[in-house]
Amino acid sequence: MSNVPSELKYVASHEWLRLEDDGTVTVGITDHAQEALGDIVYVELPDVGDTVAVDDEVAVVESVKAASDVYAPLTGEVVAINEALEDDPEVINTDPYGEGWMYRIKPDNADDFESLLSAEEYQAEL
């Protein structure tokens, strides 16, 4: 059974989101997604300053099994990326909700965060 922390929000395409104190949102892939992918060997992240819209392809995660696109769950500006993933992408496998975060976005509309899936709603999608 995949770990689905209750304090996070989710989208059906298997990304998790955490609202930070400064109003930005940290995004990564879920435990379910990393389990399905297997050992992650490469991550392509967006550039800081990129503007993304909901459902835009924003990153790529490659594993020994497949390459998988990561889609933007919110519209906004990318304000930070997890550069550590470039040298150590497998941290997504070992700590998907912590050190394995992928990027941080400043959403255009803060209310959009509240409309995302709760942990219970996401688990029902699995």
Swiss-Prot record:
The keyword NADP does not apply. PROSITE patterns: BIOTINYL_LIPOYL, LIPOYL. CDD domains: GCS_H. Keywords: Lipoyl. GO terms for cellular component: cytosol; glycine cleavage complex. SUPFAM superfamilies: Single hybrid motif. InterPro entries: 2-oxoA_DH_lipoyl-BS, Biotin_lipoyl, GCV_H, GCV_H/Fam206, GCV_H_sub, Single_hybrid_motif. One of its GO terms (biological process) is glycine decarboxylation via glycine cleavage system. Residues 24-106 form the Lipoyl-binding domain. It comes from the Bacteria. Binds 1 lipoyl cofactor covalently. Its cofactor is (R)-lipoate. The modification N6-lipoyllysine is found at residue 65. PANTHER family: GLYCINE CLEAVAGE SYSTEM H PROTEIN, GLYCINE CLEAVAGE SYSTEM H PROTEIN-RELATED. Belongs to the GcvH family. The glycine cleavage system catalyzes the degradation of glycine. The H protein shuttles the methylamine group of glycine from the P protein to the T protein. This is Glycine cleavage system H protein.
